[in-house]
Swiss-Prot record:
Active-site residues annotated for this sequence: H187 (proton acceptor)
GO BP, one annotated term: tricarboxylic acid cycle
Lineage: Bacteria, Thermotogati, Deinococcota, Deinococci, Thermales
Catalytic reaction equation(s): (S)-malate + NAD(+) = oxaloacetate + NADH + H(+)
Keyword list, A-Z: NAD, Oxidoreductase, Tricarboxylic acid cycle
Gene: mdh
NCBIfam families the UniProt entry points to: MalateDH-SF1, PRK05442.1
The protein's name: Malate dehydrogenase
Pfam families: Ldh_1_C (PF02866), Ldh_1_N (PF00056)
Keyword Secreted: no
Residues that, per the record, bind NAD(+): G11, A12, A13, G14, Q15, I16, G17, N105, Q112, V129, G130, N131
């Protein structure tokens, strides 16, 4: 059996945390031969609820769960962490502007970035799930001196999976037959799910669906899926978000399938003309614990326009965060 790895999870008593932790402990994220130590972070007022989650984790008697810690101190939760899933974030309340949300979450992710830099492993892999995820990841890496910014990522895997599911439904195929789906940009309504490179059973997706469906139905459905779930369920996506987080880390750690890629939001290094520094979703492949942006894809005018709109939104968020003194 391998030596255990340490996985820190914030917001651990929340809805996503509850859907996430048991699957990590069962080996679904890092493999059935990889023991894990879970280091769970919550705010003081949620510690009682977290105690209950810890009891349930113990009661599952997972063979791969090598240790369990619950705390309200980021420096304890992130100590020697190999992976950090930053799920906890302040939710948007009625009457709140996005700027207000950035300010409240800015404080959380500033503190967590600093704590990661201070106590986590130097090669810790960080996934930000808490929204606004892309800009929260930016704040975290800008406040984590000594850690590689490339190891800070934000989750667009849920958008990627939603896009695959919608295309599969439309074409009457299984999601496993769909390859090379791409989501560009921000995890927000400006995201751009790109079908120009996608394949269904080896055939170009746009041979099977028409442009009108793509533009008028597919793009808005994927972009607004989160809101549709809130409307139907009275609560935001939890199980599907947890599933996406597991797949994001699994593929990053264990590698992407041959001949395919996934979508991850990562600090831009200027790929495809996207401004450097913003955390932007790209198509990526991963191998041996390192990811690479897929380069050389042809970008047409339709795609370029949408890629620029979502990049501009992220630049605006970065400016707001700078004005608030968070980076």
């Amino acid at each position: 059996m391998k030596a255990p790895v340490r996985v820190a999870v914030t917001g651990a008593a929340g809805q996503i945390g509850y859907s996430l932790l048991f699957r990590i402990a069962a080996g679904e994220m890092l493999g059935k031969d990889q023991p894990v130590i879970l280091q769970l972070l919550e705010i003081p007022q949620a510690m009682k609820a977290l105690e209950g989650v810890v009891m349930e984790l113990e009661d599952c008697a997972f063979p791969l769960l090598a240790g369990l810690e619950a705390t309200d101190d980021p420096k304890v939760a992130f100590k020697d962490a190999d992976y950090a899933l930053l799920v906890g974030a302040a939710p948007r309340k009625a009457g709140m502007e996005r700027r207000d949300l950035l300010q409240v979450n800015g404080k959380i992710f500033t503190e967590q970035g600093r704590a990661l830099a201070e106590v986590a492993k130097k090669d810790v892999k960080v996934l930000v799930v808490g929204n606004p995820a892309n800009t929260n990841a930016l704040i975290a890496y800008k406040n984590a001196p000594g850690l590689n910014p490339r190891n800070f990522t934000a989750m667009t895997r849920l958008d990627h999976n939603r896009a695959k599911a919608q295309l599969a439904k439309k074409t009457g195929t299984g999601v496993d037959r769909i390859r090379r789906m791409t989501v560009w940009g921000n995890h927000s309504s400006t995201m751009f799910p790109d079908l120009f490179h996608a394949e269904v059973d080896g055939r170009p997706a746009l041979e099977l669906v028409d442009m009108e469906w793509y533009e008028k139905v597919f793009i808005p459905t994927v972009a607004q899926r989160g809101a549709a779930i809130i409307q139907a369920r009275g609560a935001s996506s939890a199980a599907s978000a947890a599933n996406a987080a597991i797949e994001h880390i699994r593929d990053w750690a264990l590698g992407t399938p041959e001949g395919d890629w996934v979508s991850m939001a990562v600090p831009s290094q200027g790929e495809y003309g996207i401004p450097e520094g913003i955390v932007y979703s790209f198509p990526v492949t991963a191998k041996d614990g390192a990811y690479r942006v897929v380069e050389g894809l042809e970008i047409n005018e339709f795609a370029r326009k949408r890629m620029e709109i979502t990049a501009q939104e992220l630049l605006d968020e970065m400016e707001q965060v700078k004005a608030l003194g968070l980076i």
